[in-house]
């Protein structure tokens, strides 16, 4: 910034990932934490609660929100009809079973006497996938006479830690209707198959299981394999590579359909299969596939067919501000970097003109309960510097701690995670107030406020359907409208910036400033 440049008034959007609101104190890591900064802000500034789940974010009624959906709604300023909902509707209407891309993958494999390998997160969590979609894809291929092999990635993160058995039994029952035509041939925890932080040693174990049947253990059935994993102290998320029955590996001429609909944790394994110049690890076998199909577009640079292309999204807040010549910053640590960039921009990979991105590496630990502060302090250092610089009209930051540590199910670590975020927010608050700026503090969905699952009796590692905080910090008092949703945040930010709201944004302004 030159001396002649007028310093910009900062407008900061803080996304406290996975921090929802729950009145009950029991098993509530947020209420157990010491949060003097947030308490002070709630005393001095207006605050409310908004919805981040179900139909309010374009998901089925009662479905918990997630980070991808949350950030897309936050950036879009409108409720977006999610891939989960689109695909479920197509299955219900029968359209899915005639889908050109999916049918082509099956028929191409059949034409060369190859098999169809279906892989994905076998879970009813509905965050990265849904088991009903996997069942439908198996039915599509089986009814067309294909040989079908299922490679099950187990959840235990968006579902209770030990909850995979009913899902495995559901698929076993389906395959029993088609004797000798298909079965579950492998399973592995999502910790290995669905990394998103370039931990290629994990992904390699999943890849070798699929391409070489290289396994830590073998079992005669999927349920037996699960029992062996539990006996070894592994929960679903961490189940080691398990071969089911006789060895089945992906062969030349086979097709693969990856049934995850959320992109971020599907990219790495997909790249291992389709990239010619892949360098994550040394591939012992590289099958020459008839087709590799991504259920949705995991990344624009991945050269593979896509069943459900993203719907065009115009005038997200990022695009709109860029077109007006405004400047913006997106900042997060690795675990949530894609969310404040790709997802917040409605599925756009590239920066907009006037946009700057800062990526802070997440700590290299096995699970984040070992370092619950993660990289929050480093994120805050960079954010405060950016606020002080006067360079940016809008600054968007994600604090990953509540969600990533909440997913571990470790209560004491989750408390420390919340306290780390609160400490950081105290610093951000001081920086914003010093610049007479505006700040909205909210969350994409809940998680850390419920750490025990009362139905299963297990620790609660998944998201919740609770409302999330909405706090306004600024130089004047204000009134916040009730009944807000995540899609209202972008129009509200534009209102604070004294900019007209584009017609595409159907959300409403939630903040009325006192004159």
From Swiss-Prot:
The active site is at 67 (phosphoserine intermediate). Substrate binds at residues 128, 157-158, 190, 196, 262-265, 336. Mn(2+) 2 binds at residues 17, 67, 444-445. Mn(2+) 1 binds at residues 403, 407, 463. Keywords: Glycolysis, Isomerase, Manganese, Metal-binding. InterPro entries: Alkaline_phosphatase_core_sf, BPG-indep_PGM_N, Metalloenzyme, PGAM_B_sf, Pgm_bpd_ind. GO terms for molecular function: manganese ion binding; phosphoglycerate mutase activity. GO terms for cellular component: cytosol. This is 2,3-bisphosphoglycerate-independent phosphoglycerate mutase.
């Amino acid at each position: 910034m030159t001396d002649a440049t007028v310093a910009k008034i900062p407008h900061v959007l803080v996304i406290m990932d996975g921090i929802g609101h729950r009145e009950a104190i029991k098993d509530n890591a947020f209420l157990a934490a010491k949060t003097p900064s947030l308490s002070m802000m709630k005393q001095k500034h207006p605050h409310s609660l908004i919805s981040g789940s179900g139909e309010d974010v374009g998901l089925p009624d009662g479905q918990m929100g997630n980070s991808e959906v949350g950030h897309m709604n936050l950036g879009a300023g409108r409720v977006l009809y999610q891939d989960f909902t689109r695909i479920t509707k197509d299955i219900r209407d029968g359209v899915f079973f005639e889908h050109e891309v999916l049918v082509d993958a099956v028929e191409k494999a059949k034409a060369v006497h190859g098999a169809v390998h279906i892989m994905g997160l076998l879970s009813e969590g509905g965050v990265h996938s849904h088991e009903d979609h996997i069942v439908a894809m198996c039915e599509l291929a089986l009814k067309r006479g294909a040989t079908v092999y299922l490679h099950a990635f187990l959840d235990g993160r968006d579902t209770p830690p030990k909850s995979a058995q009913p899902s495995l039994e559901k698929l076993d029952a389906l395959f029993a209707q088609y004797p000798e035509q298909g079965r579950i041939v492998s399973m592995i925890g999502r910790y290995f198959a669905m990394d998103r932080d370039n931990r290629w040693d994990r992904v390699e174990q999943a890849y070798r299981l699929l391409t070489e049947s290289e396994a830590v253990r073998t079992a005669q059935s999927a349920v037996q394999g699960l029992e062996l994993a539990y006996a070894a102290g592994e929960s679903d998320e961490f189940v080691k590579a398990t071969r089911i029955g006789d060895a089945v590996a992906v062969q030349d001429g086979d097709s693969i359909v990856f049934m995850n609909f959320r992109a971020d944790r599907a990219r790495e394994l997909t790249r291992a299969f389709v990239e010619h110049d892949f360098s994550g690890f040394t591939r012992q076998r590289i099958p020459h596939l008839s087709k590799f199909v991504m259920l949705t577009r995991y990344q624009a640079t991945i050269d593979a067919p896509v069943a459900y292309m993203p719907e065009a999204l115009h005038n997200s807040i990022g695009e709109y501000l860029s077109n007006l010549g405004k400047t913006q910053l997106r900042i997060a640590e690795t675990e949530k970097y894609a969310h404040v960039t790709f997802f917040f921009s409605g599925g756009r990979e590239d920066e907009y003109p006037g946009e700057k991105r800062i990526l802070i590496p997440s700590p290299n630990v096995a699970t984040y309960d070992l370092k619950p502060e993660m990289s929050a302090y480093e994120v805050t250092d960079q954010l405060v510097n950016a606020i002080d610089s006067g360079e940016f009209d809008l600054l968007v930051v994600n604090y990953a701690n509540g969600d990533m540590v909440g997913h571990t199910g470790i209560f004491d670590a989750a408390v420390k995670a919340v306290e780390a975020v609160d400490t950081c927010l105290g610093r951000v608050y001081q920086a914003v107030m010093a610049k007479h700026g505006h700040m909205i503090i909210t969350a994409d969905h809940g998680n850390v406020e419920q750490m025990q699952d009362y139905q299963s009796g297990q620790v609660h590692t998944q998201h919740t359907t609770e409302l999330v905080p909405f706090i306004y910090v600024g130089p004047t008092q204000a009134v916040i409208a009730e009944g807000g949703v995540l899609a209202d945040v972008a129009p509200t930010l534009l209102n604070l910036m004294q900019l007209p709201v584009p017609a595409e944004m159907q959300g409403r302004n939630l903040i009325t400033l006192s004159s």
